[in-house]
Each structure stands twice: as C-alpha cells, then as structure tokens.
C-alpha cells in the first residue's frame, strides 16, 4: 500500500482534500446555518473571519475561513518585542550573504534546551515579508514542549518538513500529528502550539512570503498523479474550555522579529469553523512518482509536491520537490541527475537514507546543501563513475530514503547563523565532490 508505515500512531481525526471547502464543529449546532455572522452566534460564541487573501481575490484564489470562538482573537494585551538574543529568525536583507559558492552542511544538531519558538533558525532567504515577496528557509530543533503559549507567523505560510521526532500541533482549527516523512503547512496568521510526544525534534521549513502553496498543474500527465488532492488531511474542530482566567503568552513572528503579548484565556477556543484557509498535512509516502520508461532523465519538476507560484506563469517563488523511492529503467542513459547550472536556486535536505547523485558520503540525513543561481552542481565523482559503468537493468533506488528540494527563482542569501554560527558548513565540499572528477575525453582527430 502506498503509504508510510509510521511507528508512532496518529490519534487524531481529519478531513480529506486539498483546497477543499471544509466545515467542522466540535459541538453539534455550533455552526450557523445559511449565514456567517448572525446577530447572536450559537451558544454565545463570537463570529470572526480569518482572511488569507484580499476579499476581492479571484474566486479560485480566494482564501477565507469563518470561525466561531469563545472570545475574539483581539482580546490580548499589547505586543512587546522580545530580546533579539533569545530567537534566531531575525534577518536584515542587507546582512544575508549572497555568494556563488556551492554550500553543504553537516547534519544540524538537536537542541533539547528550547521549545519550538526558540528553536527556529533562519538559514537562508530572499525578499521581504513586509511587501509579501520572497521566502525564508529555516531549520528547527527543539526538545521542550511549548507551555501555555501560542505562536503564529504574520510573514508567510510555513511548510514544515519533519526529519526527526514527532510534532503534536494544536492549532486554532484543530490538531495535527506530524511525523518524519510527513509535511505540514500552517498558513500565515494561524495560531498554534507544538508539543513533543516522542522526544526531541528536528526538521526544515520553507516559509512562503507571497501567495499560498498550490498543487502543480499536471499538464499531459492527466487528471491524477504526483500528490493527489484526496491525500491531504485537514484538522477537525477541537477546543479548550477554560472558564477561569489563565495566563497565556502569544508569540508573533512579524517581519522576522519576535513579539509577545499576554492574554488571560486560551487561544484555542474555536468551537466550529468553515472555509478553505486552514492547516493541513500530507504523507510523502503517498506521492505517485512519475519517470522515464524509455531514455534520459526527466527534469526534476516531475517530482513537485507543492508550488508557490510567482507572477510569471511556470516560475515559482518556492517549489517543494521530493526524490522518493522509485524505479529507474531508462535505457542507454546516465540515470542520476545530470550536471547542471540553473537559473533557479536549489536548497536540498535529506530526511532519511541517501541521495543517488551524492554517494560520496557527505550528504547526510539532517544535513543540507545550497546550489544558488548558476552555481554548477551535479553528481559527485563516486556517483558519476558508478552510474557510467553500471549494468542498466531495471533498478529500484531510494528504498528507505527521502531527499527533498526547495527550489526558487530567487537568488538566496545565507544568514550569519547558516554560514558561520552553526559551524556545519563543509569547507571541502567542492574538493570532495567535483575536483576528483577525471578527464575522460579522447579527441578522435588525434593519433592514439
């Protein structure tokens, strides 16, 4: 069966479908029938709208959700900026270093001393969240549960790629459990709390500052394939009912700065909701992989799970691409990804296993690489020599492995933390990968 066999059981119930109009109520009758904001909402609830696009966005792009909650989201004290030394998402665009070097990182460390909010580290990015342009690439590593707290990003949509450990995510709209080999998208503004039911966690995030993630167009593939809409899971309504005053802290990532505010009630008090703006998760094991059944290696765009499109058709601010287990059957073909210089930037990570274009040992689970715009890259020496001389029988590759890529049309700058502070950059990446490549050319015009 094309699903991942998880060792940690998911206790939650979900609604299925990508970009579907869902509705859910934790108490029967909490959803108004036939209208959105009645004079008095059922059970004394407040009606509140959560907008993910402008009101007048085209219908096929419009993202809105109506929620019915015990107290409005506005009921909190003023926000105060946190001490900059306490978090790691801050990036002045001028301080990002844009360099043409190919970069590769050793596995990033687990950190059992911090929670989700304080375990976010900006590695690279481009653009400006204040004008809703660009993206940010973050690593997360945490070992503590969030307490009576909630967090949201006003900057963009978080696409979370779990690499190690289990995330129990309590959102305003319901609960999701996210395990390695699953991804989760939490839209801009949705408040949530992360607890860790199976110990420390680590993974990757691509924050999309503009627009929202979509399924890629399938074109000649047809009506099914790649990530199918029915396999995405959205939460059902669930709420905490705390009648007495209880202090909560609300964190906001706002222009990559961290702010906090106090409130005297739970943020997780939405009893019912309906709309198409909500968090969701997806099991990467359900991806229906396509490939060549004749010759040549296709473009990696055929492995796209989700895309964050730019204003130029066919060009993405962020594509999320995976390299799952698959059969290679192409005849008379160099089967690994080819050598490449790309007008797009490519940030890669490894959830588990290995990657067929990097067999030399330096690309490891929980590590990463960045090949920026027009920075040459491709198979290392070991991969080239092996694939050039391999017996071209049908071969299954990637069993137990899952590599991924955040690809962007933007030139990506690297943060001080990503380049130096983390101390994970492999200084000899080029020396180990491509400098050992041998000259095989023999000019037929010259006497042998």
From Swiss-Prot:
Keywords: Dioxygenase, Iron, Metal-binding, Oxidoreductase, Phenylalanine catabolism, Tyrosine catabolism. It comes from the Eukaryota. The keyword Iron applies. It is an enzyme of class 1 (oxidoreductase). Its EC number is 1.13.11.5. GO terms for biological process: L-phenylalanine catabolic process; tyrosine catabolic process. Gene3D superfamilies: Jelly Rolls (2.60.120.10). It holds the Pfam family HgmA_C. Induction: During growth with phenylacetate and phenylalanine. Its cofactor is Fe cation. GO terms for molecular function: homogentisate 1,2-dioxygenase activity; metal ion binding. It catalyses: homogentisate + O2 = 4-maleylacetoacetate + H(+). Fe cation binds at residues 340, 346, 377. Pathway: Amino-acid degradation; L-phenylalanine degradation; acetoacetate and fumarate from L-phenylalanine: step 4/6. Belongs to the homogentisate dioxygenase family. This is Homogentisate 1,2-dioxygenase. It comes from Emericella nidulans (strain FGSC A4 / ATCC 38163 / CBS 112.46 / NRRL 194 / M139) (Aspergillus nidulans).
């Amino acid at each position: 069966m094309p699903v991942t066999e998880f060792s940690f059981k998911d206790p939650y119930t979900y609604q299925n479908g990508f970009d579907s109009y869902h509705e859910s109520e934790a108490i029967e009758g909490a959803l108004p029938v036939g209208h959105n904001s009645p004079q008095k909402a059922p059970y004394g609830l407040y009606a509140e709208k959560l907008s993910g696009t402008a009101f007048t966005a085209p219908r096929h792009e419009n993202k809105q959700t109506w929620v019915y909650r015990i107290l409005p989201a506005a009921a909190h004290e003023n926000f105060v900026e946190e001490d900059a030394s306490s978090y790691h998402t801050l990036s002045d665009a001028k301080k990002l270093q844009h360099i043409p070097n190919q970069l590769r990182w050793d596995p990033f460390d687990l950190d059992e001393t911090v929670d989700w909010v304080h375990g976010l580290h900006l590695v690279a990015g481009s653009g400006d969240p204040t004008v809703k342009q660009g993206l940010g690439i973050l690593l997360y590593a945490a070992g503590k549960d969030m307490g009576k707290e909630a967090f949201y990003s006003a900057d963009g949509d978080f696409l979370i790629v779990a690499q190690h450990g289990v995330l129990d995510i309590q959102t305003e709209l319901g609960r999701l459990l996210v395990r390695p080999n699953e991804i989760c998208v939490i839209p801009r503004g949705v408040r949530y709390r992360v607890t860790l039911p199976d110990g420390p966690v680590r993974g990757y995030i691509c924050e999309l500052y503009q627009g929202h993630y979509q399924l890629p167009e399938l074109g000649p593939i047809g009506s099914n394939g790649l990530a199918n809409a029915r396999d995405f899971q959205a939460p059902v309504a669930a709420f905490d009912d705390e009648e007495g005053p209880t202090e909560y802290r609300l964190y906001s990532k706002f222009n990559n700065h961290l702010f906090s505010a106090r409130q005297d009630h739970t943020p997780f008090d939405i009893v019912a909701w309906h709309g198409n703006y909500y968090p969701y998760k997806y099991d990467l094991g359900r991806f229906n992989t396509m490939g060549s059944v004749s010759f040549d290696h296709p473009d990696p765009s055929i492995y796209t799970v989700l895309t964050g499109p730019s204003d130029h058709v066919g060009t993405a601010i962020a594509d999320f691409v995976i390299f799952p287990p698959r059969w290679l059957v192409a005849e008379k073909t160099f089967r690994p990804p080819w050598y490449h210089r790309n007008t797009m930037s490519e940030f890669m990570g490894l959830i588990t296993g290995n990657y067929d274009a990097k067999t030399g040992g330096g690309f490891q689970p929980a590590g990463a690489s960045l090949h920026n715009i027009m920075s040459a890259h491709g198979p290392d020496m070991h991969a080239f020599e092996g694939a050039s001389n391999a017996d071209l029988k049908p071969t299954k590759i990637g069993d137990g492995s899952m590599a991924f890529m955040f690809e962007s049309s933007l030139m990506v700058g690297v943060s001080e933390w990503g380049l130096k502070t983390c101390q994970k950059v492999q200084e000899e990446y080029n020396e180990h990968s491509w400098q050992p490549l041998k000259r095989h050319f023999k000019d037929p015009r010259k006497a042998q």
